[in-house]
Protein backbone atom coordinates (compact mmCIF):
# COMPACT_ATOMS: atom_id res chain seq x y z
CA UNK A 1 0.00 0.00 0.00
CA UNK A 2 1.32 3.41 -0.95
CA UNK A 3 1.94 5.99 1.77
CA UNK A 4 -0.48 8.91 1.85
CA UNK A 5 1.22 12.30 1.48
CA UNK A 6 -0.12 15.63 2.65
CA UNK A 7 0.03 18.46 0.10
CA UNK A 8 0.53 21.99 1.42
CA UNK A 9 1.21 25.37 -0.15
CA UNK A 10 3.95 27.68 1.03
CA UNK A 11 6.51 30.36 0.17
CA UNK A 12 10.23 29.80 -0.42
CA UNK A 13 12.09 31.68 2.32
CA UNK A 14 15.69 30.72 1.61
CA UNK A 15 17.68 28.80 -0.99
CA UNK A 16 20.11 26.20 0.39
CA UNK A 17 22.79 24.10 -1.38
CA UNK A 18 21.98 21.00 -3.47
CA UNK A 19 18.45 21.95 -4.51
CA UNK A 20 17.18 22.35 -0.96
CA UNK A 21 14.94 25.21 0.19
CA UNK A 22 13.52 26.52 3.45
CA UNK A 23 9.74 26.79 2.99
CA UNK A 24 7.19 28.59 5.19
CA UNK A 25 3.86 26.83 4.87
CA UNK A 26 0.55 28.67 4.95
CA UNK A 27 0.02 27.37 8.52
CA UNK A 28 3.30 29.16 9.54
CA UNK A 29 5.40 25.95 9.87
CA UNK A 30 8.99 26.06 8.58
CA UNK A 31 10.13 22.92 6.75
CA UNK A 32 13.01 21.83 4.54
CA UNK A 33 11.99 21.17 0.93
CA UNK A 34 13.85 19.47 -1.90
CA UNK A 35 13.10 19.68 -5.61
CA UNK A 36 11.32 16.74 -7.23
CA UNK A 37 12.96 15.00 -10.17
CA UNK A 38 10.33 16.21 -12.65
CA UNK A 39 11.00 19.87 -11.76
CA UNK A 40 14.76 19.24 -11.89
CA UNK A 41 14.49 17.61 -15.34
CA UNK A 42 12.34 20.45 -16.69
CA UNK A 43 14.88 23.09 -15.53
CA UNK A 44 12.18 24.99 -13.63
CA UNK A 45 13.88 27.73 -11.64
CA UNK A 46 12.72 28.22 -8.06
CA UNK A 47 13.71 31.42 -6.26
CA UNK A 48 13.03 32.88 -2.81
CA UNK A 49 9.56 34.44 -2.74
CA UNK A 50 8.01 31.85 -5.08
CA UNK A 51 4.83 30.05 -3.99
CA UNK A 52 5.08 26.25 -4.24
CA UNK A 53 3.07 23.11 -3.58
CA UNK A 54 4.97 20.75 -1.31
CA UNK A 55 4.30 17.08 -0.53
CA UNK A 56 4.95 16.17 3.13
CA UNK A 57 5.15 12.68 4.61
CA UNK A 58 2.97 11.85 7.60
CA UNK A 59 5.97 10.29 9.34
CA UNK A 60 8.48 13.14 8.97
CA UNK A 61 6.76 16.51 8.85
CA UNK A 62 10.06 18.45 8.85
CA UNK A 63 10.92 17.58 5.22
CA UNK A 64 8.98 17.68 1.99
CA UNK A 65 9.26 17.41 -1.77
CA UNK A 66 8.47 20.47 -3.90
CA UNK A 67 6.15 19.18 -6.62
CA UNK A 68 4.86 22.38 -8.27
CA UNK A 69 5.81 26.06 -8.56
CA UNK A 70 2.72 28.26 -8.61
CA UNK A 71 2.61 31.20 -10.99
CA UNK A 72 3.02 34.64 -9.46
CA UNK A 73 0.24 37.07 -10.31
CA UNK A 74 2.65 39.94 -11.05
CA UNK A 75 5.09 38.06 -13.31
CA UNK A 76 4.90 37.78 -17.10
CA UNK A 77 5.99 34.13 -17.48
Curated annotation (Swiss-Prot):
PROSITE patterns per the record? Answer: S1_IF1_TYPE
Per the record, its GO cellular-component terms are: chloroplast; cytosol
User: InterPro entries, per this entry?
Assistant: NA-bd_OB-fold, RNA-binding_domain_S1_IF1, S1_domain, TIF_IF1
Q: Give one GO molecular function term.
A: ribosome binding
Where is this chain's protein located in or outside the cell? Plastid, Chloroplast
> What are the UniProt keywords, alphabetically?
Chloroplast, Initiation factor, Plastid, Protein biosynthesis, RNA-binding, rRNA-binding
Instruction: Write out the similarity annotation.
Output: Belongs to the IF-1 family.
Q: Partners and quaternary state?
A: Component of the 30S ribosomal translation pre-initiation complex which assembles on the 30S ribosome in the order IF-2 and IF-3, IF-1 and N-formylmethionyl-tRNA(fMet); mRNA recruitment can occur at any time during PIC assembly.
Function noted in UniProt: One of the essential components for the initiation of protein synthesis. Stabilizes the binding of IF-2 and IF-3 on the 30S subunit to which N-formylmethionyl-tRNA(fMet) subsequently binds. Helps modulate mRNA selection, yielding the 30S pre-initiation complex (PIC). Upon addition of the 50S ribosomal subunit IF-1, IF-2 and IF-3 are released leaving the mature 70S translation initiation complex.
This protein is called what? Translation initiation factor IF-1, chloroplastic
Please give the organism. Dioscorea elephantipes (Elephant's foot yam)
Amino acid sequence: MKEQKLIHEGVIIESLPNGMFRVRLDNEDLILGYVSGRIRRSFIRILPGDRVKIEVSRYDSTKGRIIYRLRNKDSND
